[in-house]
Every structure is written in C-alpha cells, then in structure tokens.
C-alpha cells in the first residue's frame, strides 16, 4: 500500500501518456487484467459505473479473454467523477485500432503504439520505470509499485474510511468476505501506526 502523498505523487510524475491509466487504476481498484480488458462498451457514463465481466490475458499463444472464476467477479464498479474525466480523456485521444477482435470483444480502450491491447506485464514494467525515474530526482523515494499494489491501495483507503465491508467486497470482486476483512485489519494497523507516530513526534 502506498501513502496518500505517494498516491498523489505517482500520477503527477507519470509520463503524460500513462497519467490517466495510473489514475484510473488508483480510483477504481480494478485487477490489471480487468483494466486491460475494458472496452468502450463497458463504460456507463449515465449511471457512473464500469461493467466488469471479463479479463484480458496473454500467453505465448496470444491474447485471450477469461471470464471471472466466481460470480463475485461480475460486477458494476462505481465510477468517480475524477475517474470519469480520465476515461473521457482516454476516449478523446484513442486511436482507431486495427479492428482487433479477441474472443468476441472489440474496441479495447488501452492500446499500445501498434494498436494492440496493453497487457499486465507492460504496466508492471512501466510502473517500475516510472518509480525508478522518480526516485532518481527525489529525496523521499517511492516504494516498489505494481498494478496489484494500486488495487490494494484503493481498497485500503476505502477500508480506512469505514466503508461497509460487504459493499467493499462487491466493488473489489472478492470471492470471500475474509479477503476484504483482512484489508480492514491492515488498514487499522496502518492507521494506528500513523497516529502513534504523530502523537510521539
């Protein structure tokens, strides 16, 4: 989990090309494979939600779509105003792809320079490079950051704000409430440590 200050610093320092990608990951808590699989048809601006019912993956044989292993993975994730604006910017600058269709899905939002969908490995590498560049010029370094850490950070922030655990479980698509409750325990410990440090400073 990254701190609030680090959460703000990361998108700001990102290359302009990846600013909205990182912001959306921080503001939605999506799994990176869910994020990469987003298509234009998954955006519901009228109801401010994201339709999550598939993941985009890639192996040695190529791209493929995988549906959630449990029904908990199928959900409508709330879209904040900030995330909504980021998606609008993504759509505005989106280049027309090669008309690629993967297992019946088309119009993917996040494409590389060749017009092919981005993958989890690409974002993992990109975040590593962004952190490395940031740390080169700042005295207070960022920790290791991965797409999963951004998801964990999103979830922890909502737990710290005492969101109803069942609601948070739904948003995150956790198969078990225990996964969600463990994050509440982590959030409580983190909050206690921060408060203790502020009191004895």
Show which residues each predicted segment covers.
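Single conserved hydrophobic/aromatic residue that forms the stacking wall/gate
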Residues: 1-8
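DNA/chromatin major-groove-contacting recognition/catalytic segments
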Residues: 9, 61-65, 161, 182, ...
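Basic, Lys/Arg- and aromatic-enriched nucleic-acid-binding interface segment
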Residues: 9-38, 46, 72-74, 82, ...
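Short, basic (Lys/Arg/His-rich) helix/loop patches that form interaction surfaces
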Residues: 11-18, 28, 77, 95-108, ...
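Conserved tyrosine-mediated DNA breakage-rejoining catalytic core shared by Y-recombinases
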Residues: 28, 37-95
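Short, polar N-cap/turn motifs at the start of nucleic acid-interacting alpha helices
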Residues: 42-49, 163-183
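Residue-level detector of conserved, well-ordered beta-strand and adjacent loop positions
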Residues: 53, 80, 111-113, 185
């Amino acid at each position: 989990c990254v701190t609030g200050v680090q959460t703000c610093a990361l998108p700001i320092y990102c290359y302009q090309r990846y600013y909205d990608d990182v912001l959306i990951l921080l503001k939605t808590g999506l799994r990176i494979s869910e994020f990469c699989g987003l298509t234009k048809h998954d955006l519901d601006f009228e109801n401010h939600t994201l339709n999550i019912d598939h993941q985009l993956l890639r192996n040695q044989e190529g791209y493929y779509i995988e549906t959630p292993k449990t029904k908990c993975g199928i959900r409508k994730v709330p879209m904040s105003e900030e995330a909504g604006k980021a998606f609008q910017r993504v759509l505005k600058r989106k280049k027309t792809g090669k008309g690629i269709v993967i297992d019946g899905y088309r119009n993917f939002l996040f494409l590389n320079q060749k017009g092919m969908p981005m993958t989890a490995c690409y974002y993992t590498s990109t975040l590593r490079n962004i952190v490395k560049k940031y740390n080169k010029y700042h005295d207070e370094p960022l920790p290791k950051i991965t797409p999963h850490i951004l998801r964990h950070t999103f979830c922890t922030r909502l737990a710290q704000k005492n969101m109803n655990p069942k609601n948070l479980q739904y948003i995150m698509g956790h198969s078990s409430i225990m996964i969600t409750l463990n994050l509440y325990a982590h959030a409580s410990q983190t909050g206690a440590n921060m408060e203790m440090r502020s009191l004895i400073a």
